[in-house]
Amino acid sequence: MADGTFDGIIVGGGYNGLTLAGYMARQGLRVLVLERRMAYGGATITEEVTKPGFYHNLHANFIWSYGPPHQDFELHRYGLELMRGEVERAYLFEDGAELLTYTDDPQRTYHQFKDVIPKADLDTMEDVYHRFLTKVEEEFYAPPKPTSERGVGLEGEDRAEYQKMCDMSGREVLDYLYESDRLKTWIAMNACVRGMPDFATGVGDFFMRYAASPRLSIVRHGTAQIAHSLAAFFHANGGIILTGSHVEKIIVEGGRAVGVRTADGRTFNAEKFVASAVDPPATFLQMVGEEHLTPEIAQRCRDWEIEYHTALFGFHAASAVAPDYSLKYSEEANKGLAIFFGVNTLEELDRHWEEIGNGHIPSALGGDACCHTVIDPSYAPEGGHTLLFWQFGPPADKLENGAKTYDDIKDDLLERMRARWAEYAPNLTRDNMLATYAYTPDDIQNRIINMVGGGCRQGAYTNDQWGINRPFPEAAGYRTPIEGLYMCGSACHPGGSIHFGPGYNAANVIVEDLGMERWWPPYRILGKPVLSRT
């Protein structure tokens, strides 16, 4: 006897699972979300890990200011408040040069960039936005297409050139478009912190998109509020979330997914669909079982590649001071939401990747950092500050080729990261650190078990795992070879980051398959260029 019967069951209560759940519940379906952890939200984790009153975003930190649920769910009514400062991103070079991206001010950004970047490259970047990106925005919030079918909003030579760039590696498209090493480094590092190495092939569209502003924000009171607001909308529409419910088995009968069984023996029936927000190996090899798969699908899951170059090591600190960069950089840099430093050239970035690929933490540290309290003082008690610095490294089991663990090196690495940051903001002394906390790749994969190896995107971005190949061709459109089973997590197009794309796209596909009329309107990104001449 089943413990409950629902129209749809979603495995995994991360933000993509909750996004799909909200759309389906508002559609009028009876929906159950099952989450292994005692807290839903997946990577949207905010905790007091240093001192009481200091709130730290342990995994997901930034959120895109656009995305369908913002308007469709009216998330502001459920407690979600996005915070944006005057400077969205500040990229600091060791020689004192800086690139400042001003929030929703592309003209000001253009004039600041032209002090560092040749005008021809800036004009090219703006042209990429208007010539290509404004006409292909719908590709992001839609099932992926093969290159030959992409760019339907473009004509003639523009479409051919766009398709040509889509098939390039990140580095190839940067070299194709731009001359300035600094601009190419700026784009490559922005892509890097989203888990996309510039050596990946067939991902050129990803690098083109940096001509458009991601409109980065942080969430007031922490990224956990994203999960709370999504769940509040879901609950308001009759949805049910059960935490502490690890799904052990997706029940397949006659080639169709008809329910799930949890590790503690409970069984839930699904009359219309089951959707998985977790990674392909766990979904298909563990939950579905190889007896229901073709040998080809089983092998694709075994071949699933984790993020070998972008495992995350997080430096979190409760600080007595906010970083002050003004000794070497402008006062404006102190207003930055996301701060990049430590990688000055593409050659340095190549060395970064090489060292990580050989199992080492880079000898010259570099990544992105954030002082949340510059934008939102609620992250810390009055007068205090919350700091975060992300450094990429090898996966948990590849560190020093398995000879060491992150626990072995975390204290030393924390101090190296503080000292590296202090090269740019000298006031970040040991004495000003009230408490520090290491969030290692081991911690990540132990908390979020489908972030295998301690990555941030639920699987590497490679030509074999991007676009129509993500997670693999037979499941790239959110439908899977198992009837009634769908994928909806970051292992699907368009990948990770809090843009809600996989959950939203899966909702569109499922409603179509059910023959229902969507309650929500078509979505169009209201984008802006990073920079503009006028």
Regions found by a protein language model. Name each.
Residues 180-194, 362-370, 427-493:
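A glycine-rich dinucleotide-binding beta-alpha-beta segment and adjacent secondary-structure elements
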Residues 95-200:
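Rossmann-like flavin
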Residues 2-134:
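N-terminal glycine-rich phosphate/pyrophosphate-binding loop and immediately adjacent elements
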Residues 322-323, 357-362, 406-446:
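Flavin-binding catalytic cores
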Residues 248-380:
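Mid-domain catalytic core of redox enzymes
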Residues 1-8, 26-27, 467, 518-534:
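Extreme N-terminal leader/targeting segments of oxidoreductases
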Residues 207-266:
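Helical element adjacent to the flavin cofactor pocket in flavoenzyme catalytic cores
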Residues 490-511:
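A conserved FAD-binding loop/helix module that cradles the flavin
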